[in-house]
């Protein structure tokens, strides 16, 4: 996004729809729209007086014929296109939170895809960074060697502290101070940045090398700060550790 773009923000919502196999729904933009043929997570503009959830429900009914019963706020990004400057709020919709058969009501194509193994292209520019974010597991456990371990649609997922990382490790965890001093580790496919308070969170969130944030919560005030950050909207996944 250009920092000099002063155009008004267009408020847009998009849905990350999952099926029972853990796959994500992508659809192509129909003919006649900007970026026709590009793949995206479906959604659309929030109308005046409309809530984000209501807009999400309306757009999916209009475009794909499915009904959304519940949705969880996820990431929030601002992106400048040639035709508009948009604020995109992404919602995750689990397999039991929607119903109906998918219909291409605008003549678009659609496809179920696995996180980390997307086979359709090209992707809409604002949606591209989400592909890496979707590979982050929703639950992680601390292993005996200090790594964070979980699973995604592609199998085992492991995050290793930078100080003990081997050259083949893809996901690296480092403190925000180390990120600011040394930058992105050259071997890292995904950089996790550890923060402990709101100031560190803001510094890490603003750094272009940050792929995932890990916020260690020590008390109630930390928990409140996390809730405020989530309400404001995070551009990258935020993991919380007690």
How should each PLM-predicted stretch be described?
Residues 2-24, 45, 76:
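Conserved N-terminal beta-strand and adjoining loop/helix that marks the start
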Residues 34-38:
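A conserved beta-turn-beta hairpin within the catalytic core of GNAT-like acetyltransferases
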Residues 100-159, 224, 232-235, 239:
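Nudix hydrolase/Nudix homology domain
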Residues 16, 26, 88-92, 112:
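Conserved hydrophobic/aromatic beta-strand scaffold that supports enzyme active sites
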Residues 41-73, 114:
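The catalytic Nudix box helix
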Residues 1-5, 77, 98-99, 118:
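Short, P/G- and charge-enriched loop/turn segments at secondary-structure junctions
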Residues 142-145, 153-221, 236-242:
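Catalytic beta/alpha-barrel core
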Residues 77-101:
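Active-site-adjacent beta-strand/loop module that shapes the phosphate/pyrophosphate-binding cleft
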